[in-house]
Amino acid sequence: MEEENVTSSPSTPVHRLRHRRRSNEVVTDGDKVNASPLLVNDRNKYKSFMVRTYSTLWMIGGFVLVVYMGHLYITAMVVVIQIFMAKELFNLLRKAPEDKCLPYIKQLNWHFFFTAMLFVYGRILSQRLANTMTADQFFYRLVSGLIKYHMAICYLLYIIGFMWFILTLKKKMYKYQFGQYAWTHMILIVVFTQSSFTVANIFEGIFWFLLPASLIIINDIFAYIFGFFFGRTPLIKLSPKKTWEGFIGASVTTIISAFVLANILGRFPWLTCPRQDLSTGWLQCDADPLFKPEPFALPAWIPEWFPWKEMTILPVQWHALCLGLFASIIAPFGGFFASGFKRAFKIKDFGDSIPGHGGITDRMDCQMVMAVFAYIYLQSFIVSQSVSVDKILDQILTNLTFEEQQALFVKLGQMLKDKLS
């Protein structure tokens, strides 16, 4: 009986000895795998890695195909992405019981969405639409009239939506309805701010859309690869899966890729020429000085055994380094912001439309930040802000009627004649 009491007592030396023995047992291989901090040693994570890889390859293939088709098709792709993003974000705060009592709330959201789309794209593409229609006098006058009253039409559509919202207010539902109204407008600001800059970059030359977008894709892929195989040190609490190894490895890869990729893409006129209309034909133009090769002498600290003392580069490659730095260091904070947002709403992903990636919005968080920076950098440091013949002609074609253009032509001809006489 004494032995039984000793054995059953948790405070006896025998029990403590047995406890220590259990803690010193040999760990099985399976336990070692699960205890490893590297994601590559986790079977579930490895399966997720393969699914994510297949999805990424399909997305890259589709992206390359659309880029090959040209400016107008890339813009159409941006519009489709916007619609999917808006759908995911609209659904985020919807509640089924309340929506059943408000049958028109979804239609109202989409009314505001398409009104905002008409306003944004009308302002961006109006001049190019007018340039496309100059050959047909009837369509040119029709388009000119629509452009002239574009803002009034958009405002009228918005007021219709505003009145529609007021008329659908229901007792005991006010807070939910006004919350949806505010949420809808926030979505429109986020989605269309990014897209307006993206489309503007596309028509300045596909290069200015393709390079920034590709750098974000490269950074995202290599952050995942370096983190998957080497990641041990957590980077930020908002995203526990992000590691310093992934962040640093992706940053170095992205900056190098920016310099190399700019040299490759900058040699194709089809990618570098700006598009002034909405046609789909191939482009040819005189190369901008940014895309003309120049000799570059390598620094003196390069070892003597290195075979090249001079190399040919494009001036745009130096600008590409700035884009690469931003894509690798600043743009990921768009992803961190999205992670914090998802934690606030206690969701894993914005959607499930892309296997292994989540929703469309999950892929666009860093792209939104990058598109805005690329546009601001392009307009501030690269594109000339001086008045040009093309810009004046665009203003004339957009803002003057056919009769006013004829009058301007006569007056301009008379002025030139007087100067020459």
Swiss-Prot record:
The keyword Transmembrane helix is assigned to this record: yes
Membrane topology, from the record: Multi-pass membrane protein
Chief location: membrane
Cofactor binding note of this UniProt entry: Requires a divalent cation for activity.
Keywords (A to Z) from UniProt: Acetylation, Lipid biosynthesis, Lipid metabolism, Magnesium, Membrane, Nucleotidyltransferase, Phospholipid biosynthesis, Phospholipid metabolism, Transferase, Transmembrane, Transmembrane helix
Protein name stated in the entry: Phosphatidate cytidylyltransferase 1
Annotated pathway: Phospholipid metabolism; CDP-diacylglycerol biosynthesis; CDP-diacylglycerol from sn-glycerol 3-phosphate: step 3/3
Catalytic activity: a 1,2-diacyl-sn-glycero-3-phosphate + CTP + H(+) = a CDP-1,2-diacyl-sn-glycerol + diphosphate
Entry's family note: Belongs to the CDS family.
Keyword field contains Lipid metabolism: yes
PROSITE patterns according to UniProt: CDS (PS01315)
Subcellular locations according to the entry: Membrane
InterPro entries recorded: PC_trans (IPR000374), PC_Trfase_euk (IPR016720)
EC main group: transferase
UniProt cofactor(s): Mg(2+)
One of the record's GO molecular function terms: phosphatidate cytidylyltransferase activity
One GO process term, biological-process aspect: CDP-diacylglycerol biosynthetic process
EC number: 2.7.7.41
Gene Ontology cellular component list: endoplasmic reticulum; membrane; nucleus
Positions of post-translational N-acetylmethionine modification: M1
Start-end of Polar residues biased regions: 1-12
Function (record text): May be involved in the synthesis of minor phospholipids and in modulation of IP3-mediated signal transduction.
Chain segments carrying region Disordered: 1-26
Transmembrane residue ranges: 60-80, 102-122, 149-169, 183-203, 206-226, 246-266, 321-341, 369-389
